[in-house]
């Protein structure tokens, strides 16, 4: 902001309008103007902002082979998920032995407020419109801290109830992330919370189990209309600027076009 105020950079408004490819404009448009607004001062685009895609609503990954073995349908609500976890723990479809099956794998790391993190229970909290560790705005535009909002009480009470019922990893307070993953890859756990990247992390080792394993993601904590409550972070964290006096500022946009084209058309 200081360097923009001091007139160190050249406006990229014209270069963007004339040179940006349709693909680039479509990407920025998908953020409803938020990314470009972060780099716009007095109506002028003064930088090329990064555009980090949102991870979206959190997912619960479930052992689909266990669901099938117990003739259970995939959960849609928290109540459905609670029932599934109860069935996993009490009926032991993985053959781990009495008292050895973990319903929901968990660790004391990144439990909430860590956007898109493995083990994050933000999707559960979001059902109650609770957003721990996040600065939010209420309907009147007032800023509040999510961790101290009244909605946190109900969300925490549900998680406490699950823990007391033995549906969540009993040793979660002493497990780190790697230790938690070992319960997934070792076949003890039937569920974990995460995001779209589950097949790459942490599931690969679980596929090597004797007899294999099948996992499927589900969107739970749905509202009555099928929607879910979630938050997204600011899409922009980095910027490319062009110094004042540079003869061809449009090159910055053309380089971006080329990089985008190569990424979209990469078949490897």
Please give the residue ranges for each predicted region:
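Extracytoplasmic/secretory soluble proteins
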Residues: 1-268
């Amino acid at each position: 902001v200081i360097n923009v105020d001091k007139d160190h950079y050249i406006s990229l408004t014209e270069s963007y309008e004339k040179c940006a490819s349709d693909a680039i404009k479509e990407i920025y448009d998908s953020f409803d103007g938020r990314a470009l607004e972060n780099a716009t001062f007095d109506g002028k685009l003064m930088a090329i902002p990064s555009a980090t895609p949102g991870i979206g609503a959190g997912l619960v990954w479930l052992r689909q082979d266990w669901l099938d073995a117990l003739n259970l349908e995939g959960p849609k609500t928290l109540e459905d998920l609670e029932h599934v976890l109860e069935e996993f723990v009490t009926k032991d479809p993985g053959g781990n032995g009495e008292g050895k099956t973990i319903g929901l794998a968990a660790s004391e790391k990144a439990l909430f407020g860590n956007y898109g993190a493995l083990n994050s229970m933000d999707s559960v909290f979001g059902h109650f419109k609770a957003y721990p560790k996040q600065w939010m705005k209420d309907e009147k535009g007032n800023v509040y801290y999510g961790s101290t909002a009244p909605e946190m009480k109900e969300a925490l009470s549900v998680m406490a109830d699950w823990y007391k019922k033995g549906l969540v990893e009993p040793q979660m307070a002493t497990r780190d992330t790697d230790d938690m993953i070992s319960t997934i890859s070792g076949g003890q756990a039937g569920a974990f919370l995460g995001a779209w990247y589950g097949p790459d992390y942490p599931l690969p080792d679980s596929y090597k189990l004797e007899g294999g394993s099948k996992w499927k993601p589900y969107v739970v904590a749905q509202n009555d209309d099928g929607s879910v409550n979630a938050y997204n972070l600011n899409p922009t964290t980095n910027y490319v600027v062009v110094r004042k006096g540079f003869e061809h500022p449009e090159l910055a946009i053309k380089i971006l076009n080329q990089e985008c084209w190569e990424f979209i058309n990469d078949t490897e």
